[in-house]
From Swiss-Prot:
Transmembrane segments: none annotated. It comes from Lentilactobacillus buchneri. One of its GO terms (molecular function) is pyridoxal phosphate binding. NCBIfam families: PRK08593.1. The modification N6-(pyridoxal phosphate)lysine is found at residue 280. Its EC number is 5.1.1.21. Optimum pH is 5.0 for the forward reaction, and 6.0 for the reverse reaction. Pfam families: Aminotran_3. PANTHER family: AMINOTRANSFERASE CLASS III (PTHR11986), LEUCINE_METHIONINE RACEMASE (PTHR11986:SF58). This is Isoleucine 2-epimerase.
Length: 450
């Protein structure tokens, strides 16, 4: 990789004006342009993107069909608020999303500007429909940065520090972890243990008949790409139905083909959510989100209970329609499944040679590669993970960490196999270099990652 002179100067200048609360620190990358799975920075350096803008660019950067849809719509109508009137792209998109949502029940849609407000919407609609106040969410979850979604989240102290009190009546329970288990535990044992933890609040202080919904990520994204066991998910789903509690899912990070299924919930058998949030890749990174819910639930609120001036913007809606077409007609769900299986095998092979790789979790092109100090104790190794991503960056690969010690592997779904192989080789080399003590982190970098 070449020098970062221009990038470093620009960042030094930006730091005078840009609040540190709005960016997690990794390394000095100032992106100038991008296409497919390739990034080019302001100094002319090229990188293979293994992050896809936090899983917001599933169809790849500047996909021709998405760019054309944006340009064509911008020539006709950039914006008129859907809060009062109508436009065709929004009409078409609401119908499309209602029809492709998981399950056979009639669905309705409400648009927003980010996954954060889509999760706020889940709080609103769940409380309105049930007439109940309590919401159950999960430790390790990330649902956004509006006040409601930030309260729902459980992944960072900085999301509650100095800004409380948070939204009342939100209860967090542990998310099942099939990697760190007790000796001799089977997946069945793990499911039952965590389901018992799930039930404890209901047995002590949380009235089930006053609980509006349970919100869960079928696969936790920022928590480390962790999938709940099938049996656990079915037990929670059944519990919700037995107690009149809505079952809601967050598909913002994991939806739209990321997991090798259109929706992450389709990794499980016969589960139909009452409410779901989508965003990020919905419009290829353009500011658009949606809450999709069963018709009767979505009819529980009247305007202006959940509307935004720019939500469902015509340009964003056109971008989303084009994005959904690309996912369908280019077979990206199937490609994600195939390439993800290939990448998983490559990482498992690396694990045999690199004991720092404690766990390889992969569903589609969607992986959490957990680095540990010892495969027996499973003690997290954040130092090694930081060195791996710095080595990767220096050798033309963009990847970041989750929870300090987990590599976040989420490339654009369009990544060619050749680029995927190149990136995987760089990571393999990075593990070797770190093991040999050949990687150091600059002293002035500050705190890295979450």
């Amino acid at each position: 990789m070449g020098k970062l002179d221009k990038a470093s100067k620009l960042i030094d200048e930006e730091n005078k004006y840009y609040a540190r609360s709005a960016r997690i620190n990794y390394y000095n990358l100032v992106i100038d342009h991008a296409h497919g799975a390739t990034l080019v920075d302001v100094d002319g350096n090229k990188y293979i993107d293994l992050l896809a803008s936090a899983s917001a660019i599933n169809v790849g950067h500047t996909h021709e069909k998405v760019v054309k849809a944006i340009a064509d719509q911008a020539q006709k109508l950039i914006h008129y608020t859907p809060a009062y009137f109508h436009h065709v792209p929004g009409m078409e998109l609401s119908e499309k999303l209602a029809k492709i949502a998981p399950g056979n029940s009639p669905k309705m849609v409400s648009f927003g500007n980010s996954g954060s407000d889509a999760n706020d919407a889940i709080i609103k609609f769940a409380r309105a429909y049930t007439g109940r106040q309590y919401i159950v969410s999960y430790m390790g979850s990330y649902h956004g940065s509006t006040y409601g979604s930030q309260t729902l989240s459980g992944s960072s102290l900085n999301m509650t520090r100095k800004i409380g009190p948070m939204l009342p009546s939100v209860v967090h329970v542990p998310y099942p972890d099939s990697y760190r288990t007790y000796p001799g535990e089977t997946e069945h044992d793990v499911s039952l243990r965590y389901f018992n933890e799930f039930k404890k609040p209901f047995e002590s202080f949380l009235p089930a008949d006053e609980t509006a919904c349970v919100l869960i990520e079928p696969i936790q994204g920022d928590g480390g790409i962790i999938k709940a066991p099938e049996e656990y998910m079915q037990l929670v789903y059944k519990f919700c139905h037995e107690h009149g509690i809505l079952f809601a899912i967050d598909e913002v990070n994991q939806g739209l083909g990321r997991t090798g299924k259109m929706w992450a919930i389709q990794q499980f058998k016969d589960i139909e959510p009452d409410l779901m949030s989508v965003g990020k890749s919905l419009a290829s990174g353009m500011p658009l989100s949606a809450v999709i819910g069963k018709k009767e639930v979505m009819q529980s609120l009247d305007a202006p209970a959940h509307l935004f001036t720019t939500a469902g913007n015509p340009v964003c809606s056109a971008a989303s329609l084009a994005t959904l077409d690309v996912i369908e007609y280019e077979g990206l769900v199937e490609k994600s499944a195939t390439d993800g299986a290939y990448a998983k095998q490559r990482f498992l092979e690396m694990q045999q040679r690199h004991p720092m790789i404690g766990d390889v979790r992969m569903w589609g092109l969607n992986g959490g590669i957990e680095l540990v100090k010892d495969p027996k104790t499973k003690e997290p190794d954040s130092d090694a993970a930081t060195k791996v991503i710095y080595y990767a960056f220096a050798h033309g690969v963009v990847i970041i960490t989750l929870a300090g010690n987990i590599l976040r592997f989420q490339p654009p779904l369009v990544i060619p196999r050749e680029q995927l192989d190149q990136a995987l080789q760089v990571l393999d080399d990075a593990f070797t270099a770190v093991e040999n003590g050949e990687v150091t982190i600059p002293k002035d970098t500050g705190k890295i990652g979450w």
